[in-house]
Amino acid sequence: MAATNAVEAGYGGAAENGGCAEGLLGSPMRFSPSSKLKVNHGHFMANINNNAGPGKGGTAAGGTSPTREASYANVSGSGKVIENLHQQVDALTSTNLQLTKQSNQLLEKLEGCNAREAKYLETISSLKHENENLNSMLNRKTRRVKDLDMELVQLRTSHEEATASHNQLKYQLENKFAHETELEQQCQLLQAQYDAVVDAQRRYREHYQKEIEELREALEALKKDNDKFLGEHMARLTRSQLDIDKSMSDYNGKFHRMELSQKEAVIELNEKYDRMRADLDVDGWIVLYKQMRDIAFDYAKQLDLSLPKEFAELHGEDGYYAKMLDEDRQSSPVSTSSTAVEPMSQPSPSMSAQTLSPPPLRVPKNRTPITKRSSFYGNTMPGANISLTSATGLLPGVKRTGSIRSFHGRAPSEGLSDTPTIFTASRNASPMEFPQRSALTSAASANATVRHSSVPRHRRNQSSQVGNNK
């Protein structure tokens, strides 16, 4: 068995050496010296001898074993097997030696081929470099030839253009000479005509001088008649202007008296508004609204309830009503305890008249579904296309409509406006309370400072209802 294992090991080494040789043959670019194959062959033969020696010695030493008689039959059979294996090993060894020689020869050929290939590569690189140089020279020569061709074409074109221009100028020169001869003949003819025209013009000048003198005398007469007519017309216009100025003075007096009555009504309405606001305790309602809003949000938070989005938009910290309350808080309170009214100065007769239409009413006659829906929440609702007017003290359930009140009308201590004022009347005012506006001069408009306000009837009626309910 030991001999069999040794033979198998030697065969495996030979196979490995054969595989190495095949690998070297399969990859011609790998360079390996031939001495390495010889060294491997020597190790292979030494392994065979070492493995075979102990087997034979064991057999020889086995003659002193007690079981020598029983193993004679096995020795004769295994000897034949060993001889066959030795023959196979010798055949494989000779085959391996032949393959080693062939591989050495192929390696020598491969080295020669690699050397020739390196020389060929050097030759190819030098030829490529030379080819590139020749191509660059050829390209330069080709570009030079193209440039010369283009220059030749341009020169031919320039020569043709110069020839055509020369012929054209020659033709024009001949035409100029012929035209000059014609012009000389026309000049002589025109000179004769000019002399005739000068003589006719002298005679016309004398004739028209006489007509101009006659027209000048007629114009002087017309000027005198026109001055007389203008004087009479200006006298009539002056009388008409005096009548108009007198009518304007009467009208301004009536307007001043009507304005005073309107201011008294406005002051009384403002005082009623302030008293009703104080009676309703608007600030207390605001505090109560905030407390109820906080309680509602705390209740929803503790019970883990989700409030509607519309409720948060209306009653949240940044909601619609919170913004309106902030605007109401920022607006300064006004007082109607005193009023400064200066009498209007009488306009001069020379002032110009302007007719101004009375301002329109702000309360709509028809109620749309949006205004009906906003009767509980106030003036406007989020999402409705209605202009928002700042109001003071807006409460849920109380509708506040916008009013036009100038700041100097409620607080005389803040200063009076010098701009032309706009008068606005309430809906339930009498027809005589609507003032008629006329244009004043700059001095009269600077002295006339009047505060004005309007309180819509709907707001006063609703405030009265809230006061009665309270």
Curated annotation (Swiss-Prot):
Protein name in the entry: SWI5-dependent HO expression protein 3
Q: Which gene encodes it?
A: SHE3
Polar residues bias: where?
A: 331-340, 368-378
To which protein family does this belong? Belongs to the SHE3 family.
Q: How does it sit in the membrane?
A: Peripheral membrane protein
Organism of origin is: Eremothecium gossypii (strain ATCC 10895 / CBS 109.51 / FGSC 9923 / NRRL Y-1056) (Yeast)
Q: Which UniProt keywords apply?
A: Coiled coil, Endoplasmic reticulum, Membrane, mRNA transport, RNA-binding, Transport
Q: Which residues form a coiled coil?
A: 82-234
Q: Where in the cell is it found?
A: Endoplasmic reticulum membrane
Q: Which GO terms describe its molecular function?
A: RNA binding
GO CC annotation, single: endoplasmic reticulum membrane
Q: Any idea what job this protein has?
A: RNA-binding protein that binds specific mRNAs including the ASH1 mRNA, coding for a repressor of the HO endonuclease. Part of the mRNA localization machinery that restricts accumulation of certain proteins to the bud and in the daughter cell. Required for the delivery of cortical endoplasmic reticulum into the emerging bud.
InterPro entries noted in UniProt: She3
A Pfam family that this protein carries is: SHE3
Q: Name one GO biological process term.
A: endoplasmic reticulum inheritance
Organism taxonomic ancestry? Eukaryota, Fungi, Dikarya, Ascomycota, Saccharomycotina
